[in-house]
Structures are given as structure tokens and as C-alpha cells.
């Protein structure tokens, strides 16, 4: 079977274009991956745990706790995942879902200078109340009610 010069040239260009696009396509598809590495170099939040009972999660905040000092933030693990906690003032704590509303990546970083939680999957940023400061996320993080008393943070889960 004989192939024309024109057909040969077209097929060669198509093959070359496919080879050129494949790495870019691979990078694009990988950027949409929803799994994150909790030990990524960007992860900077300390991880704490608490005790679950009757729809609440109780976290002891002793003087050595990562959340003892105002301005700090942490990740608190529990049976259904993790929560983000920010401590903006002496008795105030903000508790948010750690799941980014863009593509459900885990948020594990906090920029204390800007007061923002950062999702390194796609660059979304959220303030300490969960509002979107920078997309691509368009919805705020889910908020959990909490109260602080007797050195314990009690979160409704």
C-alpha cells in the first residue's frame, strides 16, 4: 500500500503534536488530583487530637498546647477526618472543615501573617471565618460551633 507524501506529512505532524501535548496534558490532569500528601512540605499546622462523646469533640488546651497562644492555628483529628482551628483572641476559637470546597483537597497550612488557611492543591485561600479570599474555590469552608471553658475547647461535630 502506497501512501501519498501529503498524507505522510499530515500523519507525521499529528504524531509530533500528540507527543508535544502529552506531558502538558499529564501535568494538567495531575493538578486536578484530589488526594494530597499530609506530609507535604507546605504543611505547617500542628496536629492535635481530642475525645469524642455524644456529638462533641473535646480538646484540652493546656499551656503547652499549640492552640494556647492567640494567633496560632492547628489541625484537630477525629473519627470523621480533621478540622482547622484558629485562636484569634484569648477565649475565641474558630473551627472549620479542613476540606477545600473547590475539589475536596485537605487544607493543612496557615499563613499567620495574612490570617489565611491555604489549600496547596489549587491555591485557594480562606480567612479564619472560612470565607474565600482567593479562588478557585467559590464556597466558604463549613463552620463548626464551639465553646471554650476550663481550658477545654468543645466542638459540636
Can you describe what each PLM-predicted range is?
Residues 107-112, 125-131:
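Iron-sulfur (Fe-S) cluster-binding segments and ferredoxin-like electron-carrier domains
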Residues 1-23, 27-37:
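N-terminal secretory signal peptides and thylakoid transit peptides that target proteins
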Residues 35-110, 143-157:
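N-terminal pre-ligand scaffold of iron-sulfur
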Residues 26, 94, 113-115:
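Processing junctions and N-termini across compartments
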Residues 114-122, 133-142:
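Short cysteine/histidine-rich metal-coordination sites, predominantly Zn2+-binding motifs
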Residues 120, 125, 129, 154:
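Extracellular/periplasmic metallocenter environments
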Residues 30, 98, 103, 117-119:
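Extracellular secreted precursors and ectodomains with disulfide-bonded cysteine-rich loops/domains
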Amino acid at each position: 500500500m502506497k501512501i501519498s507524501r501529503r498524507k505522510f506529512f499530515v500523519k507525521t505532524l499529528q504524531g509530533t503534536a500528540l507527543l508535544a501535548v502529552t506531558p502538558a496534558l499529564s501535568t494538567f490532569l495531575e493538578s486536578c488530583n484530589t488526594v494530597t500528601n499530609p506530609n507535604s512540605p507546605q504543611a505547617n499546622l500542628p496536629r492535635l487530637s481530642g475525645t469524642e462523646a455524644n456529638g462533641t469533640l473535646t480538646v484540652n488546651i493546656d499551656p503547652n498546647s499549640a492552640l494556647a497562644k492567640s494567633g496560632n492555628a492547628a489541625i484537630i483529628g477525629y473519627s470523621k477526618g480533621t478540622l482547622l482551628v484558629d485562636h484569634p483572641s484569648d477565649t475565641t476559637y474558630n473551627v472549620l472543615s479542613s476540606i477545600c470546597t473547590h475539589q475536596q483537597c485537605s487544607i493543612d497550612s496557615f499563613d499567620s501573617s495574612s490570617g489565611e488557611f491555604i489549600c496547596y492543591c489549587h491555591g485557594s485561600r480562606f480567612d479564619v471565618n472560612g470565607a474565600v479570599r482567593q479562588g478557585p474555590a467559590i464556597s466558604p469552608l463549613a463552620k463548626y460551633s464551639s465553646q471554650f471553658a476550663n481550658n477545654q475547647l468543645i466542638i459540636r461535630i
